[in-house]
Amino acid sequence: MVVKAVCVINGDAKGTVFFEQEGEGCPVKVTGEVTGLAKGQHGFHVHEFGDNTNGCMSSGPHFNPYQKEHGAPTDENRHLGDLGNIIANGDGPTPVNICDCKITLLGANSIIGRTVVVHADPDDLGKGGHELSKTTGNAGARIGCGVIGIAKI
């Protein structure tokens, strides 16, 4: 059973991101575009709550149901919401093209109803040695966000 979701990102960064999962246990494909980003890497995460009443700040911390430390998408020890960085070339829209085996659109730990947040700075993937490295990747301000919703198949 294919499941699809969509997220419209608003803020200084804007864009649309699509999620697709072929079935339970299958990886989730994340595709789309984000505009309004300075050249360089920008942290890209799923945060716990689908609440944007106070802008991106009310979306809470990274989605982390297993209480792990922050890490890279390829790390075993990472938040479920840790999707690494997207890379802006400073000229036109920034593509999003991620395939992740830990997030899901199905079951109790589904990311549907949670918030995607784009950050101002690079995510150091938990390896930067900064006091925020193991919680946020020291990725800086939240410059764009949107709630992930169910999409028509």
From Swiss-Prot:
<keyword id="KW-0862">Zinc</keyword>
<dbReference type="GO" id="GO:0042803">
    <property type="term" value="F:protein homodimerization activity"/>
</dbReference>
<feature type="binding site">
    <location>
        <position position="79"/>
    </location>
    <ligand>
        <name>Zn(2+)</name>
    </ligand>
</feature>
<dbReference type="GO" id="GO:0004784">
    <property type="term" value="F:superoxide dismutase activity"/>
</dbReference>
<keyword id="KW-0479">Metal-binding</keyword>
<keyword id="KW-0049">Antioxidant</keyword>
<feature type="binding site">
    <location>
        <position position="47"/>
    </location>
    <ligand>
        <name>Cu cation</name>
    </ligand>
</feature>
<dbReference type="GO" id="GO:1901526">
    <property type="term" value="P:positive regulation of mitophagy"/>
</dbReference>
<feature type="disulfide bond">
    <location>
        <begin position="56"/>
        <end position="145"/>
    </location>
</feature>
<keyword id="KW-0186">Copper</keyword>
<dbReference type="GO" id="GO:0005777">
    <property type="term" value="C:peroxisome"/>
</dbReference>
<comment type="subunit">
    <text>Homodimer.</text>
</comment>
<feature type="binding site">
    <location>
        <position position="70"/>
    </location>
    <ligand>
        <name>Zn(2+)</name>
    </ligand>
</feature>
<keyword id="KW-0560">Oxidoreductase</keyword>
<feature type="binding site">
    <location>
        <position position="119"/>
    </location>
    <ligand>
        <name>Cu cation</name>
    </ligand>
</feature>
<keyword id="KW-0963">Cytoplasm</keyword>
<dbReference type="InterPro" id="IPR036423">
    <property type="entry name" value="SOD-like_Cu/Zn_dom_sf"/>
</dbReference>
<dbReference type="InterPro" id="IPR024134">
    <property type="entry name" value="SOD_Cu/Zn_/chaperone"/>
</dbReference>
<feature type="binding site">
    <location>
        <position position="62"/>
    </location>
    <ligand>
        <name>Cu cation</name>
    </ligand>
</feature>
<dbReference type="InterPro" id="IPR018152">
    <property type="entry name" value="SOD_Cu/Zn_BS"/>
</dbReference>
<dbReference type="Pfam" id="PF00080">
    <property type="entry name" value="Sod_Cu"/>
</dbReference>
<feature type="binding site">
    <location>
        <position position="82"/>
    </location>
    <ligand>
        <name>Zn(2+)</name>
    </ligand>
</feature>
<dbReference type="GO" id="GO:0005507">
    <property type="term" value="F:copper ion binding"/>
</dbReference>
<dbReference type="InterPro" id="IPR001424">
    <property type="entry name" value="SOD_Cu_Zn_dom"/>
</dbReference>
<comment type="similarity">
    <text>Belongs to the Cu-Zn superoxide dismutase family.</text>
</comment>
<keyword id="KW-1015">Disulfide bond</keyword>
<feature type="binding site">
    <location>
        <position position="62"/>
    </location>
    <ligand>
        <name>Zn(2+)</name>
    </ligand>
</feature>
<feature type="binding site">
    <location>
        <position position="45"/>
    </location>
    <ligand>
        <name>Cu cation</name>
    </ligand>
</feature>
<comment type="function">
    <text>Destroys radicals which are normally produced within the cells and which are toxic to biological systems.</text>
</comment>
<dbReference type="GO" id="GO:0008340">
    <property type="term" value="P:determination of adult lifespan"/>
</dbReference>
<protein>
    <recommendedName>
        <fullName>Superoxide dismutase [Cu-Zn]</fullName>
        <ecNumber>1.15.1.1</ecNumber>
    </recommendedName>
</protein>
<dbReference type="GO" id="GO:0048167">
    <property type="term" value="P:regulation of synaptic plasticity"/>
</dbReference>
